[in-house]
Amino acid sequence: MAYQRVLLKLSGEALMGDQGYGIDPAIVSAIAKDVAEVVAKGTQLAIVVGGGNIFRGLKGSAAGMERATADYVGMLATVMNAITLQDGLERAGVPTRVQSAIAMQEVAEPYIRRKAMRHLEKGRVVIFGAGCGNPFFTTDTTAALRAAEINAHVVLKATKVDGVYDKDPVRFPDAVRYEHLTFQDVLANELGVMDATAIALCKDNTIPIVVFDLFGSGNISRAVAGEPIGTRITSAA
């Protein structure tokens, strides 16, 4: 495998499938199956999951909520997703721990870096919930932060599209997909694949990012193996 320790970023929207809201059990089962295959090959895997399928802080803020309050509600949504994903993984035979940046000891461990790394070394998947515990930071930034903290070799951003495009491929059929970008390309052109804070964190810590389509069968395994898939973002051109 190309990467020994991986941080997988899953959007909350990915978990809802075509439902428009909530969690699609079939999607959770499919993700669990792919993750089980990766872990069985010896890869150490941590996951950061978003909460946009349940609540998105920015939308709440736009609707009149105080931004910090809306972000905290969004963090709680990520914990709901994390626990659901943990259940799916354990039904697939993958030992899993959820660590929350907001204390809720009845359902999750507190986030402790050394403990998370020990879980990974023992072959357990660690799911990080509640973002980084602070408002005004996205779960993409959390993914970059946790990747740096656990010494991950790559951030795999699993999305609904098969990479980064020069414009929205849903709206523009002539959109062109990039196979490779530098961090500076993403920042300078405001490509929007991740927020600038997340990109800067990965850039500063020399952690490559691979953006790929979550829904292609076996794509998580392919991304972990370093196969050419989606768009790769690195320091060098």
UniProtKB/Swiss-Prot annotation:
> Which residues does the annotation say bind UMP?
G51, D71, C132, G133, N134, P135, F136, F137, T138, T139
Question: Which CDD domains does the record cross-reference, listed alphabetically?
Answer: AAK_UMPK-PyrH-Ec
Q: Where in the cell is it found?
A: Cytoplasm
Give the UniProt record's GO annotations in the biological process aspect: 'de novo' CTP biosynthetic process; UDP biosynthetic process
| Major localisation | cytoplasm
The entry's cellular-component GO terms read: cytoplasm
| Assembly notes | Homohexamer.
Provide the protein name.
Answer: Uridylate kinase
